[in-house]
UniProtKB/Swiss-Prot annotation:
Pfam families: zf-RING_5. Its main location: nucleus. This is Probable E3 SUMO-protein ligase RNF212. SUMO E3 ligase that acts as a regulator of crossing-over during meiosis: required to couple chromosome synapsis to the formation of crossover-specific recombination complexes. Localizes to recombination sites and stabilizes meiosis-specific recombination factors, such as MutS-gamma complex proteins (MSH4 and MSH5) and TEX11. May mediate sumoylation of target proteins MSH4 and/or MSH5, leading to enhance their binding to recombination sites. The keyword Metal-binding applies. Disruption phenotype: Both male and female mice are sterile. Males do not make sperm and have much smaller testes, a characteristic of mutants with meiotic defects. Testes show an absence of post-anaphase I cells, indicating loss of spermatocytes at this stage (stage XII seminiferous tubules). In females, ovary size is similar to that of wild-type animals, and high numbers of oocytes are present in mature animals. Complete synapsis is achieved but crossover complexes are absent. It comes from the Eukaryota. The keyword Coiled coil applies. It comes from Mus musculus (Mouse). Residues 164-291 are annotated as: Disordered. Its EC number is 2.3.2.-. A zinc finger (RING-type) spans 7-46. Keywords: Chromosome, Coiled coil, Meiosis, Metal-binding, Nucleus, Transferase, Ubl conjugation pathway, Zinc, Zinc-finger.
Amino acid sequence: MASWVFCNRCFQSPHRKSSFSLTSCGHVYCHSCLLKGTKNECVICQAPCQTVLLSKHTNSNIQTFFLGIDGLCKKYSQETSQISEFQEKHRRRLVAFYQEKISQLEESLRKSVLQIKQLQSMRSSQQPAFNKIKNSVSTKPNGYLFLPPNSSLPDRIESMDIDLTPPARKPEMSAGPSRISVISPPQDGRMGSVTCRGPQHLSLTPSHASMTKASRVPPLQMPYKELSPPPASQLSSRATQGPSPSVSSSWTGPPRQPISISGLLQRQCAGSASPRGMDTEKMSPFLPSTPTNLRSVASPWHACVHR
């Protein structure tokens, strides 16, 4: 036990035969003074307390209070050095990591600066050619502005030209006749001349087209007279010769459509030129009736339009 330990009542220093006790209030008594006092009560401060016998088997926390200062400092210095060494080791590892990271960042920064310098030198060398191309392509031939790719979207929208004119429509061609046949009236028993004009000779406007549609002439219907019954000799001769091809074909075929002026004139010419002398009066039963008053015949020209 340390040399400074003694009894707080009789001031006796410890020896081999004596024993000392420690109270919870912090006082030390020898065994003889402890027996003189009241149990569970301190002799000096008269406060209730508990006592613990001091020996080698006492709790280490209690023994710490009786250690020497030099030994206590040595013990705690060793513990402190171990703790500081452990912390310093981890601190050095952290510093090494940050140093390596800083060196990597410095290297990347150096490369970036070098690359920027190279790009600036290339730009300065190519600036005249770029300005020339920019001036030549600043405006396109169709009048729209050329925008660089780095321009923002609102700038592009504001600079866009909007054409409000409606799209041009193709001129609508008026539906007109593909061919016009002009027939002059017959003169001296001869058929008039026929003149045909195709679409290449026509330049009809809508007004002319309406006039052309209005000037169409309906099919001409020839008047006919009732035939007197032929004599018996003519009937017998016709029976031996057989029926006329034109008449038989007219009866055997389907009903005929209205005959145009050109068809009538051709049939008239064919009837006058036949060797049997078939005239219009013989063909009249097969032709439609014509009104007596034909105003269209009195006109000098008749137009027949063929689709």
